[in-house]
C-alpha cells in the first residue's frame, strides 16, 4: 500500500527537520536534557484509572491548526488552554509540536505542561529515536507512534527507545492490517484508533466500532478524531470505549475546558459526572 500523499509530504519534511534538529543539538546533549527533565507523570495510568471506573478518560488536544482545516484557534495560549482543560476534567493533554503542517512548537508543550498537573503526549510524526529522546527532554510523558508512517522494525525501535527514557506509547491505527501489525510488534496498553482516514482525510466513527472486536481486552482503546457531540460520546460509551482524544471540538470553543465538561460530564439532567481532574 502506498503512503498517502499528505502523509508522504509530512514524512519527507519530517526527515529533513530531524536532520536539522540533530545538527543544532547533538543526541548526547538531548540525552542529558532528558535525564534532567521532570519525572514522567504517568500518561497511561491516568487513562487506565479513569476507564477502569467507566468514566470518560479524555486526552484534550492543544492544536492551533491542521492541514485539512487550517487555523482552528486564533487566540492560542497553550498555558491558558491547559488550565482550562484541567478544570474541565481532562485526564491528559495532547500537544501538537509539528511546525510546518500544524503550526505547533516544542515551546507549546513546555508551556502547557508547566501550567497544570496533567500528563502530556507529544503529538508529532515520530520517525527517528532522536525525536523520542527529545520528547522526554521537552517534558513529554508519552509519544505517538503512527503505524501507517512506520515499518515494524522502526516501530519496535522507537517503542524501545521510549521505554528506555520512561515514556509511555500510544500506537495509532486506522484499519485491520495496521492493528494487526501494532498488536504483533508492540506491548503498549494504549491503542488509538484514528477515525480519520489519512488517505482521504474523511472521518467515520465506524472505524473504531469495526476494529473493536479485534482488540484484546487488556488493551485500552482510545478513539481519535470525529467526536463532536454528546451522541458521538454515547455511541462509544455504549460499546465500552471510555478513552477519547479530542481536539477540534474544543479548539473552536470560546472556553475549551467548559466545552469538554459539557461534552463529557454534563448530562442526565445537568448532573456533572466524574469531572474531577485527577
Curated annotation (Swiss-Prot):
Pfam (any one): IGPS
Gene that this polypeptide is encoded by: trpC
Signal peptide residues on this chain, from the entry's feature table: none
Top-level taxon: Bacteria
Family to which the UniProt record says this protein belongs: Belongs to the TrpC family.
Keyword field: Amino-acid biosynthesis, Aromatic amino acid biosynthesis, Decarboxylase, Lyase, Tryptophan biosynthesis
SUPFAM superfamilies the record matches: Ribulose-phoshate binding barrel
Stored HAMAP family: IGPS_B
Organism annotation: Pseudomonas aeruginosa (strain LESB58)
EC main group: lyase
Keyword DNA-binding found: no
Protein name: Indole-3-glycerol phosphate synthase
Gene3D superfamilies per the UniProt record, alphabetical: Aldolase class I
Molecular function per GO: indole-3-glycerol-phosphate synthase activity; phosphoribosylanthranilate isomerase activity
EC number: 4.1.1.48
Alphabetized CDD domains for the sequence: IGPS
Chemical reaction(s) catalysed: 1-(2-carboxyphenylamino)-1-deoxy-D-ribulose 5-phosphate + H(+) = (1S,2R)-1-C-(indol-3-yl)glycerol 3-phosphate + CO2 + H2O
Pathway field: Amino-acid biosynthesis; L-tryptophan biosynthesis; L-tryptophan from chorismate: step 4/5
GO biological process, one term: L-tryptophan biosynthetic process
